[in-house]
A protein has these predicted regions:
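Active-site neighborhoods and metal-handling regions in enzymes and metal-associated proteins
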Residues: 1-177
């Protein structure tokens, strides 16, 4: 069960989290493997959310971890650079890794100013929410492995709210458990 929940606090600021919970009470072996890949991508991406970095850097860090994990279990093949360049991962991960968070759950604000990425600054808040979604309804790109039945129907996303500050990124939703 994938639960994407938001809330508005009394000061009008918002929170936005996603957790994936096994309906049976326990992840299958395949679900656990996918969960661990997504969790690793999220943790690595959060570490990259530093002052002066930008949302694309955070996204690309998560994307590389996802791709490496998917290659390791045989759901993607080829070099990571080629997979990214030709977007050969899009049938398994079709969105960006996060968005601004503030007075709106998907807060306003540009990610680019002309040809430059907006740098992360002290006090900014963004979400970090990588995911993997394995469907038999989305065509597998030519040259990529056919998806084994054991993986089909698995969808995992983990989202937390991250405050950019002077030292290290702070996970504001830290009190919410990860399964």
């Amino acid at each position: 069960l994938l639960v994407d929940a938001g809330c508005s606090l009394t000061d009008y600021y918002n929170g936005d989290i996603t957790r994936t919970i096994p309906i049976s009470g326990k992840f299958s072996q395949e679900q656990k493997v996918i969960y661990e890949i997504v969790l690793s991508a999220q943790k690595t991406a959060i570490k990259s959310a530093l002052i002066g970095s930008n949302s694309s850097t955070v996204h690309n860090v998560a994307l590389k971890v996802l791709i490496e994990g998917l290659k390791e279990i045989g759901l993607l093949s080829g070099s990571t650079e080629e997979i990214i360049e030709h977007q050969l991962y899009k049938h398994l991960y079709m969105h960006r890794t996060g968005h601004w968070l503030g007075l709106d759950v998907h807060d306003v604000g540009a990610y680019r100013m002309g040809e430059y990425e907006v740098p992360l600054r002290n006090g900014m808040i963004l979400t970090v929410e990588p995911g993997i979604y394995i469907s038999d309804r989305i065509p597998v790109p030519e040259g990529q492995p056919i998806i084994d039945e054991k993986w089909k129907g698995i969808g995992i996303r983990i989202e937390d709210d991250i405050l950019i500050n002077d030292t290290n990124p702070e996970v504001l939703s830290l009190s919410l458990i990860h399964i």
